Structures are given as structure tokens and as C-alpha cells.
Design a protein with these regions (language model features):
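A structural boundary/capping signal
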Residues: 2, 26-204
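Bacterial N-terminal signal peptides that target proteins for export
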Residues: 2-13
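Bacterial N-terminal signal peptides
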Residues: 12-22
Length: 204
């Protein structure tokens, strides 16, 4: 295991996840998450929206999930590997001296939310709808809060994670999914059915 992988594991540790390339999608078989009603916005996203208000009031024209193709999956794999390799994992406390700062990793360092923001930005620039690129808060097997990017497709929901270069169906990650951005408004969040109270700070 190289030093970059070790750093990623120290910043956002997830037990049992291998950091290797690949598409974890047997026969493209996956399901979509079942979401509930509106819920609290993570405090880090709330502060991010104050800094980038234009990014938090977008209402995508189409709410249909992306069509799952080999081309889309290659795009997801390429962006995942590129961002994971280009950003050095570092905690908000080490970077900013405080917790829960969501920011683009333009200086080449960041924590799990920052990887998510960058992947979302890059995929959006390639034409993937923001309705299909959803910042998502999960709980890891050890109970710690974590953030990943959910990609909605007509073949199910897939996850891009800074802890692995694989693109996995959401229900094969081992995480408990708690909340994610609403598909119809980038500034709103919805609960995910079956989740529990999030450990990441939220605006109540």
C-alpha cells in the first residue's frame, strides 16, 4: 500500500474497502435509494452555499436519471481515479484550523467532502446533470460520518468515494446512507429511508 493510500485511509477511514480500480456492477444490477422528505442541511454545505450561492439554487431542467452506458461508467472511473490521485487527503482542522469546511480542493489538499465537490464539478462540466450528481452523507461501519458522491442512473445509484477507485452500487459499499441533496434543488437535502441520525454537523 503506497503512502497516498495510507493518507486517504487516515483522513476518512472505511473498514474493508480496497483502493483499486474497477467497476463493482454485476450485470449493471443495482437499485435506487429510497428517499424521504426534506431534512437538515449539513453545516458544511450551508457555509459552502454562503460562499457559492449560485451553486445552491440550481433547479435542473430534467430530473430523469442518467442513462447507464459503458461510456458513462468509464467517465465515472476516470474522474474518480484522477481526483483521488490529485488531491492529498488532509483534515479540515489541519488545513483551516476548524472542522466542517467544505471547499474545492484547488490547492491540492482536502477531506472527503472536498473530493466529492471536485468530482461533482468535473462530471458536471462533462454534461452530467446535477440532478444525477448528489452529495451524500453516510455512516461508515465504525460509526464515523463520511461523504461520498451518488450518481443516479437508470441502472441504479452508484457511489464515488475518495477511499477507493472503484465505482460501486450504493448497496455494496457497506455504508449506512443518511441524507443527500435533493434532485430538484441543489440547496436542499432529503433523508434516505433506513438511515439514522447523522454524525456530521447539520443545520437544525
Amino acid at each position: 500500500m503506497n503512502s497516498s493510500t495510507m493518507r486517504r485511509l487516515r483522513v476518512c477511514v472505511a473498514a474493508g474497502l480496497a483502493v483499486t480500480g474497477g467497476w463493482m456492477a454485476p450485470a449493471w444490477a443495482s437499485d435506487a435509494m429510497a428517499t424521504g422528505g426534506l431534512t437538515s442541511q449539513p453545516i458544511g454545505h450551508y457555509d459552502f452555499c454562503k460562499q457559492h450561492p449560485g451553486e445552491c439554487s440550481i433547479r435542473p431542467a430534467s430530473l430523469a436519471p442518467a442513462t447507464l452506458t459503458d461510456g458513462l461508467m468509464r467517465k465515472l472511473l476516470n474522474v474518480t481515479a484522477r481526483v483521488n490521485a490529485s488531491v492529498k487527503p488532509m483534515s479540515d482542522m489541519d488545513i483551516y484550523g476548524t472542522d466542517e469546511v467544505w471547499a474545492y480542493p484547488d490547492k491540492g489538499v482536502g477531506d472527503c467532502e472536498d473530493y466529492v465537490l471536485e468530482k461533482r464539478r468535473q462530471l458536471s462540466r462533462t454534461g452530467v446533470s446535477l440532478a444525477d450528481l448528489l452529495i451524500t452523507v453516510v455512516r461508515k461501519p465504525d460509526g464515523e460520518g463520511h461523504a461520498v458522491l451518488t450518481v443516479r442512473t437508470d441502472g441504479g445509484d452508484y457511489v464515488l468515494d475518495n477511499l477507493t477507485d472503484k465505482v460501486k452500487p450504493w448497496d455494496q459499499t457497506g455504508y449506512r446512507f443518511l441524507k443527500r441533496q435533493a434532485i430538484d434543488n441543489t440547496g436542499r437535502w432529503v433523508s434516505i429511508r433506513g438511515g439514522q441520525q447523522v454524525l456530521v454537523g447539520s443545520v437544525q
